[in-house]
Each structure stands twice: as structure tokens, then as C-alpha cells.
């Protein structure tokens, strides 16, 4: 959608109490090599939500969805990760879950490596959220292990690491309780 529409949606969401805003990386611009346009859109959303939140005396977190299945290469995933972080993302997220290829361990590994490098260079911790195609306890454990190995145990908390699917909750609860559950 048009940037003006996105900004108005973000403004209204924060005015209504949203404490997090998710946006999708401007993929048309990014894939065309117009990295400045892609980064500028993130910066404008960041500025918008910060201004509204400041008037309310609070902070709002920005998650940028990279849609890694459409980026295809580790290099493109890394470039998008750094672009999003440098433009103001508090979290980077693999996907919307609405494309053919969503979260993959390979994409997660690349993104976590980028987060680690960004943290080493800036001291700012960026969160990671794999989303789409994660449906079993084994899937969740894979991503948990990647975050633990690449970023360290200090990232294993709700402020820096989350899953972007509710159906994995049933699988995890079933694994813990040793019975079939269907809460979500």
C-alpha cells in the first residue's frame, strides 16, 4: 500500500494502544536494488510510531518482516537484515507466513549472525522472530538452538526471541504434558 496509508495505519494503531507494530520490508524497492527507498520507509514508520508513543509517554517496538522466502539468497537475507536494523527495527522477523517459503533454519541462522554482528558493532540488542511453517516441537527446538548457539542464552527471553505461530503452542504443550491438546 501507499506509504501515507501505512503511516496513518501505524499512527492509529499506536494511538489505540498498540505496543508493537509489524511492517513488511518494501520488497519491490529492495529487490530492485533501491535500498535507500526500502530503508527510508522503515525510518518513516519508526519516526511516526515514536512520535505518537512519545506523546503518550511510552515506547512502541517495531518489527520488520523480511519475507526471507522471497529474498532467496543468504546475501540478500543478510543485506535486508542489516538494512532493517540500521533503519530502526527492534525485531527482525522471517516472514508473514503467507508466501510459499517461510521461516527456514538457514534464513534464521543468517539473520541471527547479522543480529550478533550488529550487536557487536552497536551494543543494541535486536530481537528475532521466526514465523511461518513452524508447527512442531522439533521445529521450535531447531530455532531455539540456533538462537542459543549464535546469539547466546541472554537472547532466550520474550523480549528478544519469539515464535510467530500459535499452532506450535499446541505441539509444545502436548510434548510437555504428554497428551494431545488443542488450545490454539
Specify the residue positions occupied by each region the protein language model found:
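Alpha/beta enzyme core
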Residues: 1-128, 135-166, 174-184
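Metal-centered catalytic cores of metalloenzymes
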Residues: 170
